[in-house]
Amino acid sequence: MARSGLDRIDISPQPAKKIARVGGLQHPFVKTDINTINVEHHFIDTLQKTSPNMDCRGMTAGIFIRLSHMYKILTTLESPNDVTYTTPGSTNALFFKTSTQPQEPRPEELASKLTQDDIKRILLTIESETRGQGDNAIWTLLRRNLITASTLKWSVSGPVIPPQWFYHHNTTDTYGDAAAMAFGKTNEPAARAIVEALFIDPADIRTPDHLTPEATTKFFNFDMLNTKSPSLLVGTPRIGTYECGLLIDVRTGLIGASLDVLVCDRDPLTGTLNPHPAETDISFFEIKCRAKYLFDPDDKNNPLGRTYTTLINRPTMANLRDFLYTIKNPCVSFFGPSANPSTREALITDHVEWKRLGFKGGRALTELDAHHLGLNRTISSRVWVFNDPDIQKGTITTIAWATGDTALQIPVFANPRHANFKQIAVQTYVLSGYFPALKLRPFLVTFIGRVRRPHEVGVPLRVDTQAAAIYEYNWPTIPPHCAVPVIAVLTPIEVDVPRVTQILKDTGNNAITSALRSLRWDNLHPAVEEESVDCANGTTSLLRATEKPLL
């Protein structure tokens, strides 16, 4: 299959034309201002022209609406009259395996032409070409008008999709304040390095790409850090070892997810996700950097600095608990064996040794949350604590606990009521649509870091662990702009995939059906009031077709 050429776009600020040589072919590209592409207008136009009763051959209308929309956006980028173009014909090659298509295909036409395998092939190519996420122009464009894993809201009755979801183009994450989000974005590379160095089983990495006796390739494609990726030629950041692009729900076309770290083999020629025949499961990691623990280790008046020093000198579970409980709202919330957890924190415990004075339980659980609480209650987290860095060597290592182990098991697990758990549940749902036969193993990673001392500023820190040696010359490294790691917590998460799948699939399909009927009515009766239905909770609201969308 020919590569789509969709990520051959340089989005750096200075305008200039270049030639990128990829696979022996020359592909012209120019720099782009993605704001010139009216994504919202076209998506709504596609919805308005789609029949609610179209024949989808056992599939859903939403996926073909999404594909038709993406086709329009991608071919727009090919137009030499626009500010940006990708390789002419690349979109048709991706969708129809031909360089020509007489006209823009409507959803009904795509439904008659594309098989389920075709849909997966197209969407897996999109995922590959959108790695780099926020630094990738295609990722930014195609993410609009999607309900994303990080922005989907949940009520007591389940996931909530707003009645006018198709007008919403601002998919900025809304969890936490601006300072906390900035801290997370800044320190995510540090957490990624820790994940690579400590959390990924080396057995997951050195599996051969071929099982035949004559096979010579003895590593996953991602072991090579995707050094042949076209993205390296056009100014987008270097694609990391386990980076993931935009995964679009193959069931409804409505929901999207971009995983922080995804451990899955890729096709060495196309870069698309392609699990090895020997793989039985796929691990992925959601990273959360906790800004509220940031402290200056030399500030004698800061209680975090004091409990940190105690933990470093005497690494025990009691001292770890004291450090985590130093702040007013710690990242671990105790709720008691007979109580319910609140929605406050992503990590919870009911272990008596972690009881905290003044704790408050939460309201009654929904049936789904209670079910997931039961699935996760017996799961333990693992914790690593880091030594002060060796600046001369440029390395940082983990501390051995009193038990002699580098990781400590603690009775802390994921909170099914928290937004982080919901986000991971949605990610699991989206990924399961591509690989239904494989066991998905999601993890929540909690990163805690401290301010750098003056002599540590500007120094990259190699995470020096035995497992990290498998990366050879691409050793996981804490970038110089990141905080110094103090603690990393790895929490496995158990999601009832079949149950979540049914809920999200039904919610998505209902939202699409409601949108098709609503917008089709608007076209026929532009001045008539109508009821718009929230498919998640059954509520209705009066909208006028003449009202301008809230963009």
Curated annotation (Swiss-Prot):
Domain of life: Viruses
Subcellular location: Host nucleus; Host cytoplasm
UniProt-listed InterPro entries: Herpes_alk_exo (IPR001616), PDDEXK-like_dom_sf (IPR011604), Restrct_endonuc-II-like (IPR011335), Viral_alk_exo (IPR034720)
GO molecular function: DNA binding; endonuclease activity; exonuclease activity
Enzyme class: hydrolase
Listed EC numbers: 3.1.-.-
Site, Required for function: residue positions: 188, 260, 286, 288
GO cellular component, one term: host cell nucleus
Keyword Hydrolase set for record: yes
Xref: HAMAP family: HSV_AN
Subunit: Interacts with major DNA-binding protein; this interaction increases the nuclease processivity of the alkaline exonuclease.
Name of the featured protein: Alkaline nuclease
